[in-house]
Structures are given as structure tokens and as C-alpha cells.
Amino acid sequence: MTNPNHPFLAACRREKTPYTPVWLMRQAGRYMEEYRELRAKFSFLDLCKRPDLAAEITVTPVERLGVDAAILFADILLLLEPMGVGLEYTKEDGPMIQRPVRTGADVNRLLEFAPEKAFPFVFETVRKSCAALNGNVPLIGFSGAPFTLASYLIEGGGSRNYLHTKHLIYSDPGAWSALMERLSRAIVGYLNGQIAAGAQAVQLFDSWAGCLSPDDYRQYVLPHTRATIEGLTPGTPVINFSTGTAGLLELIRAAGGDIIGVDWRVNLDEAWERVGFDVGIQGNLDPVALFAPPDEIRRRVGEILRRAGGRPGHIFNLGHGVLPNTPVDHVIAMVQAVHELSAR
């Protein structure tokens, strides 16, 4: 287990650190040659379900990039697989739900499961990753948040307008609430299993919450996200991350979390002021900025750090995941710039 005074964990508690810690969403991904070599030999699900391979993918970016935390290699939709909805991963369309949830009867047909029986491979990956990291940096566990997972279940895949999701919310709020409660319970068990296996922080990904109006988020999402966060193992830092939610920041803060993760569509200083300085903030470089020349990357890193003002509680990250084809040397340059420009 990593020393609790490690800069990443200290930043989660809004304590002073010798520099601003940095990690990246999708830091283990297609932009890395090591990942592509494994992916050429194994399916995506094989990589997720073989702890030896998943742990290798989890740890490699720490060694390669010099980041201050590892994040578990898995997929947010794995949690849906034991519910009996026919989760499939296709090369053409990505993850697809074969039996989408569209009615109250569909919600009632969802299978309950025990996390320790459904996800032994995930928890073993956590243990193997922690052993390989050897206390050098902490491991972050993660899950999709209730709304984003519900949207996948209802839409059957990606969506531009979330028509089916909003139709269920508006036409049958009772079924919607029942679905969100089921998902919240499942997420709590899943994340607490990761924590028990060695994860020292967790992140909730609410990647699709930006499609909601403030009133809809307040009524139909906030209570369930809050219940999820409140159900997690006490003392474990929680990062509440979402995208496209500049209009919802105060509500997201009310939903909970020790750190609020924001994207590049809002200035970091404005976001932090709006959520309050009694929580930490994570972000918020545009992932596309990593395609810029290294001196421009360094300038943009410096601007974000300037907006953070050296205040304890800032964790540097992108506003979303690392994109495929991102130059690895540019990622390394970004990490080095964060460490050098924030040294105190």
C-alpha cells in the first residue's frame, strides 16, 4: 500500500504537496505501443478478464510516463454484464447492449449478483496491480456513475440525444428510480470490492451527465449519485468526474465527492470557485492539446496551474481520456511540465 502522504493522496485531502500530482484518464490505451501489441493478440474482454494482462496494462503507464497514480484497466460497462442484458463488444460499433432496458418490466428482469462472484478477475487485477506498483504510487479504482450506466442500458449503446433515456425518465419516473437504485447498489458493491482489494481512491465516471438540464439532474440523478458516494468505504477519496457539465457544477458538488473532475469547457479557477474550495478539483487540459508542439503543451499546462493558484487540492488531468494516436513523447512532456512548473 502506498504511503498515505503520497502527493496524490495528500492532494485528495487538500493538503500541501511538493508539486501538483498528475495522472490521465485512459493513460493505458491505444496510443501506447505496449497496449497495441497486447491488443493484437487478445480481445478487449480477454484483456479485461485476465488479471495478469490487465495488471500489466495498469502498471505500464506509471513506469513509462512518470504519473503519480495508476488507474485500474477495465471497462465501465463490465458492471452490466452479469445483469443479463447481453453485453457485447463489436469492432464496428463498440460495446452494445443486446436487450436494452426500456420499461418497468425490463428493470424488474435485471439480474441481481454478488460482486465477489461476478468480478473476481477485477479484484484480482487490483491485487496484482498493487503488488506490481509496490507502494510507489496509489491505484485508483473506478466505475461508471448511475446515470451513465443507466443510459447505456436504456440506449443500448452510444447516443446523441438520449431519447430513450429521457423518455423513461419522463414517462415512468418510478421505473427510472428503481433502475437507478439497482445500479447504485451494484456500483457500491463493485467499488467497495476494489477498495478491499487495495484501491486507495476511486473515480465515478458520469461521462454522459452533460445531456441533462439542471432541473433533471437535480431531481432524477443527484440523489442516486449521492447515495452511491455515501455507500462507499469511509476514508477512501472519491473523484466525481463528468463532462459537458459546466452548467451543473454546483449540483455535481452537492451530489458528493472529495474531488470534482471537470473538462476543458470551463476555466479551472471558475469551476473551483463554483464548487467551493472545501473540495479538491481535477483537470482540465483538452486532450487534443497533446497533439500540439511540446512548448505549446507546456504553456497550456502553465496556464491551468496558474488558474489553480497553488491551492492545495488540485490534481492535474485531462478533461477526458487520452485520444488514440496521441504522441507518447508529448504525454511525457506534459507530465514533466506539470511536475516542473508546480514544484514548490
Annotated model-derived regions:
Residues R36-C48, G104-P115, R253:
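Short, basic, glycine/proline-bearing loop/turn elements
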Residues I76-L79, G94-P95, G104-A105, P146-T148:
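A short acidic, glycine/proline-enriched capping/turn motif at secondary-structure boundaries
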Residues E92-A132:
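A gly/proline- and charged-residue-enriched helix-loop-helix capping module
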